[in-house]
């Protein structure tokens, strides 16, 4: 059998487009691309194609944008392409069991964690939120469960103390295509060795919410600093002062010990705004008031020092 596979690609955001780009540079043949319908975006709410659609159009690949793959007529779109395998990366639609069984080699998925840790919607963010020392990418054979399929390939990635969801996303978007190409080669050769996930090690990466982004001063400084990095670039951590929401882009944990009530400002200068927490002190260094650009603590103190006087309480 040839090492070249007939592939259907299903994906939507930039993370997926980077994987499609790697496949387009490989020996494999992309016979069709499935992506989410165009969505309103930007100030004018103009209908905007997904990054995957844009890339597919540049390469004249047939594009399909069903709202669901449950209707039988939409499932025929998959069957008629006669693919060897379907590669799914952040597609955003559920694949019914009948679709999973259509390609000769089934469907595989690129997931942004070391499964079985962080199954679900937000694995990159939750790995930071939990203070994990490492994460990575798992290529798995898809089944009807939520990220429950057998694992085909893993690549690990250390999480650095300064990593945010944005930087970790970029790292995994580079590792994922590498792992995908290795996995496809193994499947083409018949040398893949599926590994069953250990159910005892499963954790779930719940979807992020805007409500979760509000800094809870009853948590420790360590946990709050993790939240700030995990929620960058979305939904972005924030606190409220003088009824104004202030986004927080960067902060650090100080070794300082302070007995002030959580949420109390204990010091503010050009090096940061120091806030007492349930355990430790958080030094906030980059902030963004509503309607303004992100700025240093020094710049915000120059214009709004009254917000950050000693003893003020942040909500």
Curated annotation (Swiss-Prot):
One of its GO terms (molecular function) is methionyl-tRNA formyltransferase activity. Keywords: Protein biosynthesis, Transferase. PANTHER family: METHIONYL-TRNA FORMYLTRANSFERASE, METHIONYL-TRNA FORMYLTRANSFERASE, MITOCHONDRIAL. It is an enzyme of class 2 (transferase). InterPro entries: Fmt (IPR005794), Formyl_trans_C (IPR005793), Formyl_trans_C_sf (IPR037022), Formyl_transf_N (IPR002376), Formyl_transf_N_sf (IPR036477), Formyl_transferase-like_C_sf (IPR011034), GART_AS (IPR001555), Met-tRNA-FMT_C (IPR044135). This is Methionyl-tRNA formyltransferase. Pfam families: Formyl_trans_C (PF02911), Formyl_trans_N (PF00551). One of its GO terms (cellular component) is cytosol. (6S)-5,6,7,8-tetrahydrofolate binds at residues 113-116. It comes from the Bacteria. Its EC number is 2.1.2.9. Belongs to the Fmt family. Attaches a formyl group to the free amino group of methionyl-tRNA(fMet). The formyl group appears to play a dual role in the initiator identity of N-formylmethionyl-tRNA by promoting its recognition by IF2 and preventing the misappropriation of this tRNA by the elongation apparatus. It catalyses: L-methionyl-tRNA(fMet) + (6R)-10-formyltetrahydrofolate = N-formyl-L-methionyl-tRNA(fMet) + (6S)-5,6,7,8-tetrahydrofolate + H(+). Gene3D superfamilies: Formyl transferase, C-terminal domain (3.10.25.10), Formyl transferase, N-terminal domain (3.40.50.170).
């Amino acid at each position: 059998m040839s090492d070249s596979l007939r592939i259907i690609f299903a994906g939507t955001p930039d993370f997926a487009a980077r994987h499609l780009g790697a496949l387009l540079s490989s020996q494999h043949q992309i016979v069709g691309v499935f992506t989410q319908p165009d969505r309103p975006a930007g100030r004018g709410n103009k209908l905007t194609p997904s990054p995957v659609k844009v890339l597919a159009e540049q390469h004249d690949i047939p594009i399909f944008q069903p709202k669901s793959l449950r209707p039988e007529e939409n499932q025929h779109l998959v069957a008629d392409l006669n693919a060897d395998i379907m590669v799914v990366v952040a597609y955003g639609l559920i694949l019914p069991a009948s679709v999973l069984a259509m390609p000769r080699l089934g469907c595989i998925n690129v997931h942004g964690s070391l499964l079985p840790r962080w199954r679900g919607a937000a694995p990159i963010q939750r790995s930071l939120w939990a203070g994990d020392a490492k994460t990575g990418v798992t290529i798995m054979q898809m089944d009807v469960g939520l990220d429950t399929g057998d694992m085909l390939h893993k690549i690990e990635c250390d999480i650095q103390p300064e990593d945010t969801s944005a930087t970790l996303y970029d790292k995994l978007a580079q590792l994922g295509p590498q792992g995908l190409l290795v996995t496809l080669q193994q499947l083409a050769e018949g040398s893949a060795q599926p590994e069953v996930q250990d159910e005892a090690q499963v954790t779930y990466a719940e979807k992020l919410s805007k409500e979760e982004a509000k800094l809870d001063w009853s948590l420790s400084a360590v946990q709050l600093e993790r939240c700030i990095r995990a929620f960058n670039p979305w939904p972005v951590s924030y606190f409220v002062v003088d009824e104004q929401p202030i986004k927080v882009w960067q902060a650090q944990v100080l070794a300082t010990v302070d007995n002030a009530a959580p949420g109390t400002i204990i010091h503010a200068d050009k090096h940061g705004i120091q806030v007492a927490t349930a355990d430790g002190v958080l030094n906030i260094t980059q902030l963004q008031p509503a309607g303004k650009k992100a700025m240093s603590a020094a710049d915000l103190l120059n214009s709004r020092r009254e917000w950050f006087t000693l003893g003020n309480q942040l909500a």
